[in-house]
């Protein structure tokens, strides 16, 4: 039995659904939200790589590197906001983000 494109796509769909569920169930903790968004991006990347492999086109794999770059920048900015929020309010609750308005 070999692993087919359907296996990769179903795994990607399960990871994506898990991240969406994580976002909807926990909307208070900023760290969990960032992890769920990263899991969502990785599920999309898995689908891109699977399609790229099975279609023989390298464009999907190149696009994954761009997504990883944007995801790294998003994580850095999100963690910087988290540090500022924790220093000012001693909490990582998303509801406290309006306190950072200047």
Swiss-Prot record:
One of its GO terms (biological process) is ATP synthesis coupled electron transport. Keywords: Cell inner membrane, Cell membrane, Membrane, NAD, Quinone, Translocase, Transmembrane, Transmembrane helix, Transport, Ubiquinone. InterPro entries: NADH_UbQ_OxRdtase_chain4L/K (IPR001133), NUOK/Mnh_C1-like (IPR039428). HAMAP family: NDH1_NuoK. It is found in: Cell inner membrane. It catalyses: a quinone + NADH + 5 H(+)(in) = a quinol + NAD(+) + 4 H(+)(out). NDH-1 is composed of 14 different subunits. Subunits NuoA, H, J, K, L, M, N constitute the membrane sector of the complex. This is NADH-quinone oxidoreductase subunit K. It comes from Methylibium petroleiphilum (strain ATCC BAA-1232 / LMG 22953 / PM1). Pfam families: Oxidored_q2. Its EC number is 7.1.1.-. One of its GO terms (molecular function) is NADH:ubiquinone reductase (non-electrogenic) activity. NDH-1 shuttles electrons from NADH, via FMN and iron-sulfur (Fe-S) centers, to quinones in the respiratory chain. The immediate electron acceptor for the enzyme in this species is believed to be ubiquinone. Couples the redox reaction to proton translocation (for every two electrons transferred, four hydrogen ions are translocated across the cytoplasmic membrane), and thus conserves the redox energy in a proton gradient. GO terms for cellular component: NADH dehydrogenase complex; plasma membrane. The chain crosses the membrane at residues 5-25, 31-51, 62-82. Belongs to the complex I subunit 4L family. It is a multi-pass membrane protein.
């Amino acid at each position: 039995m070999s692993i087919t494109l359907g296996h990769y796509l179903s795994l990607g769909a399960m990871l994506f659904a898990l991240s969406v569920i994580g976002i909807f169930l926990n909307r208070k903790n900023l760290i969990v939200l960032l992890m769920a968004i990263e899991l969502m991006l990785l599920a999309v990347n898995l689908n891109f790589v699977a399609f790229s492999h099975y279609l023989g086109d390298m464009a999907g794999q190149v696009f994954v590197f761009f997504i990883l770059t944007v995801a790294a920048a998003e994580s850095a900015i999100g963690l910087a906001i988290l540090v500022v929020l924790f220093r000012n309010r001693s909490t990582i609750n998303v509801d406290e983000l309006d306190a950072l308005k200047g």
